[in-house]
Amino acid sequence: MPLLLYTCLLWLPTSGLWTVQAMDPNAAYVNMSNHHRGLASANVDFAFSLYKHLVALSPKKNIFISPVSISMALAMLSLGTCGHTRAQLLQGLGFNLTERSETEIHQGFQHLHQLFAKSDTSLEMTMGNALFLDGSLELLESFSADIKHYYESEVLAMNFQDWATASRQINSYVKNKTQGKIVDLFSGLDSPAILVLVNYIFFKGTWTQPFDLASTREENFYVDETTVVKVPMMLQSSTISYLHDSELPCQLVQMNYVGNGTVFFILPDKGKMNTVIAALSRDTINRWSAGLTSSQVDLYIPKVTISGVYDLGDVLEEMGIADLFTNQANFSRITQDAQLKSSKVVHKAVLQLNEEGVDTAGSTGVTLNLTSKPIILRFNQPFIIMIFDHFTWSSLFLARVMNPV
């Protein structure tokens, strides 16, 4: 019988950038023994692998995902699996089970969840998990206890015999939890289920240096050699961390937002998007971070709105997580009542990017008395966005913007 797993997220910087603040970034900053820090390497490696697979499957489409959301949802699901299914799932997420126990993995996600929940008052943060269970199914008490303990997941009874009503109820639940920003999660999906797992993330933060609202102008965006679209192009003239990479064909800037996060905007040279994406790794990010210099930059970035639903089943199978979708799936730690297998792993993402920031002293950008000509950097062709929480080193979001319209 089918089991559906959904992850959904929202990054909506209508007041800057939607993000998370963990805790004091100076506290035990180098203490990599913290449970959540033990996840960092595996989570980032999984993030780039998943991103590259999705990009390859949709070479001309916008891509926007929250890797940490997907990792957390799949890790939670692993609590209900046994045997080869469990080992394959955790190894597919990048964990070496000879080096890290399953308990340590789940403790790491538990601490990560708790840190994300400790957002600053200037941020809005909602992150959660929910399990929707058909009334005919008896959930094993151990599974219910584990997902509540590690992932603070709610368990809600549903009547999946009436699929239309059940899907509306789940849509309503997610809509309420994400303050009306994630809607119609089940739109266009007609597969009945007896158990649905949902992971959702909603968060809002602010640019430390907002874009100048009055400077936004309509400009050309060159999608490809034959397609040009008009976009509202934002402008920020300030001191920004900038790098013209000598090894990869790209330029990039790193910008901070209120909290513990950082965002990279990467502009590949014309026709070199795939070259840059292929090189994305932890080593590349470390090299970029070390090479950035504070520069006077006139930065032009288009206002972006992207919405998409991704069925991750084929991608996960390519990445070695295959048992979930076959009759070999072993979900015997969820219930003894039925033979379950995953029919879908769906991830819904929404991205909006605009100018606004916190209206406080020192947060409206930097006015410069230029002694040299500023670098002019126009994101008027396909580009990459990466957002990290630099306390937990979580890969919050990865995007490829092919067409911002």
Curated annotation (Swiss-Prot):
Supply the SMART domains for this chain: SERPIN (SM00093)
- Which CDD domains does this chain map to? serpinA6_CBG (cd19554)
Instruction: Give, from the UniProt record, the effect of changing L115H.
Output: In CBG deficiency; Leuven; decreased cortisol-binding affinity
The record's keywords, sorted A to Z, are:
Disease variant, Glycoprotein, Lipid-binding, Secreted, Signal, Steroid-binding, Transport
Q: Where is this site: Conserved cysteine within steroid binding domain?
A: C250
Which amino acid positions bind cortisol, per UniProt? Q254, N286, H390, W393
Q: Which GO terms describe its molecular function?
A: molecular carrier activity; serine-type endopeptidase inhibitor activity; steroid binding
Q: Mind telling me which Pfam families this protein's record contains?
A: Serpin
Entry's Gene Ontology cellular component terms = extracellular exosome; extracellular region; extracellular space
Say yes or no: keyword Signal present: yes
Q: Which residues form the signal peptide?
A: 1-22
- Indicate whether Transport appears among the record's keywords: yes
**Annotated localization:** Secreted
Which chain regions cross the lipid bilayer? none
Q: Which residues have a glycan attached per UniProt?
A: N31, N96, N176, N260, N330, N369
Note on domains (UniProt): Proteolytic cleavage leads to an important conformation change. This reduces the affinity for steroids.
**What does this protein's UniProt record list under function?**
Major transport protein for glucocorticoids and progestins in the blood of almost all vertebrate species.
Which disease is this protein implicated in? Corticosteroid-binding globulin deficiency: Extremely rare hereditary disorder characterized by reduced corticosteroid-binding capacity with normal or low plasma corticosteroid-binding globulin concentration, and normal or low basal cortisol levels associated with hypo/hypertension and muscle fatigue.
As for family, the record states:
Belongs to the serpin family.
The name on file for this protein is Corticosteroid-binding globulin
Write down the species: Homo sapiens (Human)
Gene name for this UniProt entry: SERPINA6
